[in-house]
Regions:
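Extracellular protease catalytic domains of secreted zymogens
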Residues: 1-112
Length: 112
C-alpha cells in the first residue's frame, strides 16, 4: 500500500519556486498527514521524526502518512482533455495514478 498526499506546486518550465501542503479551504480541497493509529512503523521510516503542532520533534512510533505526495491543487494541477475540452484537474485522485505509473516504470527497469 502506498498512501498518496497532495501538494500545491508553484513552478515554471525550468524550476520549482515552492511546494507546500495542498490546503485550499475556499474550494473545499485539502490533504493532510499524520501518524497512523493502525499501521506499524515500516522499515523505511525507522529513525525518522515528525513535528508536533508546537514545533517539537518526536520519533515516529507508527507509520507516518502520506508516503508520497504530488501536485494535487486544481489551480496548479494537470492539463487534460475531456470529451474534446481542455481543462485542469487535481486532487489526490490525480496523484494516485501518477505514482502508480511511476512505480510501474521503476519496477520495469532491468534487474528489478
Amino acid at each position: 500500500m502506498l498512501a498518496c498526499g497532495g501538494t500545491n506546486l508553484k513552478a515554471n518550465q525550468t524550476q520549482i519556486a515552492s511546494e507546500s501542503v495542498w490546503n485550499d479551504g475556499a474550494s473545499g480541497g485539502a490533504t493532510g498527514g499524520g501518524i497512523s493509529s493502525f499501521f506499524a512503523l515500516p522499515v523505511w521510516q525507522k529513525g525518522l521524526s515528525a513535528l508536533t503542532t508546537q514545533g517539537a520533534t518526536f520519533a515516529l512510533g507508527m507509520r507516518g502518512v502520506p508516503d508520497v505526495s504530488g501536485d494535487a491543487d486544481p489551480e496548479t494541477g494537470y492539463d487534460v482533455r475531456v470529451d474534446g475540452t481542455d481543462t485542469v484537474i487535481g486532487g489526490t485522485s490525480a496523484v494516485a495514478p501518477l505514482w502508480a505509473a511511476l512505480v510501474m516504470l521503476v519496477c520495469a527497469l532491468p534487474g528489478l
